[in-house]
Amino acid sequence: MLNSFKLSLQYILPKLWLTRLAGWGASKRAGWLTKLVIDLFVKYYKVDMKEAQKPDTASYRTFNEFFVRPLRDEVRPIDTDPNVLVMPADGVISQLGKIEEDKILQAKGHNYSLEALLAGNYLMANLFRNGTFVTTYLSPRDYHRVHMPCNGILREMIYVPGDLFSVNHLTAQNVPNLFARNERVICLFDTEFGPMAQILVGATIVGSIETVWAGTITPPREGIIKRWTWPAGENDGSVALLKGQEMGRFKLGSTVINLFAPGKVNLVEQLESLSVTKIGQPLAVSTETFVTPDAEPAPLPAEEIEAEHDASPLVDDKKDQV
């Protein structure tokens, strides 16, 4: 009964105006009132402030500053294995698995369209048909900066206007085509593991979505699809990001969806729906080995060892003596 009421509110409430109001309030400096709101939020959601670079809630001038607070580097170490892709966000996995042609699993018994998620861009969709996806939900208590799973060169960004439904587990199980309906920012990267899309999905009360290369993408909410492109490789104007580097952030909210090309990566076997995610931990492994970390060096053939012994030294030991 309660869940039905909550779902009804999702359709009845003026989500856009609520989101604008929340964004406006979260950006205001209100002194003691700001601190009070932050303290209540920390207590209610059990936010671990010991992980933050600034653990004192009085150091945040606005609620938004608190919400996108940076963490201390050592609390999210990045897996350095070049064959491993890492988790892009703190949260829980909503769903993950194989993309079945054009179908992505939203919740048990509910699929949505890959092409619809990508705003009807069939050329981009073709890159990921029968590939792999991971959907990560960020709850209010989580760190809300989003990082790179691997090294990447940005090629395209698309802003897609849409609804602002909540993206929690209740709505994911009950609102059809949720992620293809909500406002979102699609980022396409060239990587060592083939093309990768990282999609930042908005929701109710999500005041803004930002990227490190373009700043605030939304608001303003103009109701039209916008598209930007960047050059490949090391050309002038290209945007290159490293594994584990921040690429964007939410000011309240939301969900991150990753898409990988078919045959390029295998998801870590232990991961399943509702698995907890932490930035920097293993998410997937390449199907091809680029470098074997900590591998024992192969022994030199005997003839090469003898040749090394016979070679003249690069430094004259006698000359260097004092």
From Swiss-Prot:
Swiss-Prot/TrEMBL keywords: Cell membrane, Decarboxylase, Lipid biosynthesis, Lipid metabolism, Lyase, Membrane, Phospholipid biosynthesis, Phospholipid metabolism, Pyruvate, Zymogen
Pathway where it operates: Phospholipid metabolism; phosphatidylethanolamine biosynthesis; phosphatidylethanolamine from CDP-diacylglycerol: step 2/2
List of residues that carry Pyruvic acid (Ser): 254
GO biological process, one term: phosphatidylethanolamine biosynthetic process
Ranges of biased composition (kind: Basic and acidic residues): 308-322
Site location (Cleavage (non-hydrolytic)): 253-254
Cofactor(s) needed: pyruvate
Listed GO MF terms: phosphatidylserine decarboxylase activity
Localisation per UniProt entry: Cell membrane
Topological type in the membrane: Peripheral membrane protein
Protein family (similarity comment): Belongs to the phosphatidylserine decarboxylase family. PSD-B subfamily. Prokaryotic type I sub-subfamily.
Subunit structure: Heterodimer of a large membrane-associated beta subunit and a small pyruvoyl-containing alpha subunit.
Name recorded for this polypeptide: Phosphatidylserine decarboxylase proenzyme
Lineage of source species: Bacteria, Pseudomonadati, Pseudomonadota, Gammaproteobacteria, Enterobacterales
Gene symbol of the encoding locus: psd
